[in-house]
Amino acid sequence: MPTIQQLVRAQRKRIVKKTKSPALCACPQRRGVCTRVYTTTPKKPNSALRKVARVRLSSGFEVTAYIPGIGHNLQEHSVVLIRGGRVKDLPGVRYHIVRGTLDTAGVKERKQSRSKYGVKRVTKK
């Protein structure tokens, strides 16, 4: 506990909160252009080919973003929307691509959790 004289001499330092998604620049989402679409392997003990894209954002950053869902239509020069959210078993992947917006199509034949994958409700006839 500092004395009053110590507080007069030097004010208390504020704790600076570091953001987990700096490329978004305090925005909920950002638009970007895919520069490379590829697959990568996760950390141990998992094994898969995870679909990711290197995206140049409108904020000037170039980030790696995960493509969620089964199948996608992304290729180089596709315009995508990026949101925050890391992928635990892919080091360096701190962003997700939003499905069903801009050039990204929604997941085909998705019945549950549709809003997360950009799928409209199917109407029964």
Swiss-Prot record:
CDD domains: Ribosomal_S12. GO terms for cellular component: chloroplast; small ribosomal subunit. It is found in: Plastid, Chloroplast. Its main location: plastid. SUPFAM superfamilies: Nucleic acid-binding proteins (SSF50249). GO terms for molecular function: rRNA binding; structural constituent of ribosome. Keywords: Chloroplast, Plastid, Ribonucleoprotein, Ribosomal protein, RNA-binding, rRNA-binding. The keyword Plastid applies. GO terms for biological process: translation. PANTHER family: 30S RIBOSOMAL PROTEIN S12 FAMILY MEMBER. This is Small ribosomal subunit protein uS12c. It comes from Nephroselmis olivacea (Green alga). The gene is rps12.
